[in-house]
Amino acid sequence: ISGITAMDLRRQVSRRMSKKKAKGYKKRADRKYLLGRTYKDYKIYIGKNPNVFVTQMDTVYNDETNGPFIQTFKFINSGLIFAILHNSKTAESMKQGIDLLESILGAQVFRKYVHILLTDRGSEFSAADAMETGTDNTRRTRVFYCDPMQSGQKGSLENKHIELRYILPKGTNLRALGLIDQNALNIVLSHVNSAPVEKLGGKSPLDVTDFMYHDLFEKLEAFGLHKIEKDKVVLKPYLLKK
């Protein structure tokens, strides 16, 4: 272009973007953690390893700023939902939740029933390598991610959240309801997992886990999950007020 020198072009290229203008551009998220872990990769892995146990993972919360945050896990084969209470929703806290689950179950039982973790692409689950690595620095699980905006790909867990919400409704102050610690969450889990499920032949997830996966049941029972008699199961917000 006439009148523009090479020096002018160099100045233009090297000139920094103003802070005001830079704010208009969203930093591109690092998606390297998805490599080999997409839903397509998950389907391929399941196709080659049809007998491995799958656990679906997510977070449930009402107040994104103040929490509390519930890290949920559903053991697909037994239909049982487990959960860990957090005060923050970060990649580090979710990794610590998996560390705790491994500690509760023990390495052998964990690696058996949490062979695969299927979750969504929320930023709190982006530390794939850390989540996959056990406290002994060896692989403890394989993490895979649903496609964007496809929560139905882990619909089994999403459906269980509906039952969780009977006790912990959206829009409520969860701490005011009584969800103040893990013991309170264990009470919620005990009731949800003691409710009979049609797909399980009228048995509860805890019944099925006890009968078919007793090693898993023993670990969860020792942590604080207990069977509730069917006529005493409460799936209402007043449960923790009792």
What are these regions (language model features)?
Residues 1-176, 180-190, 195-197, 205-242:
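Secondary-structure boundary/capping micro-motif
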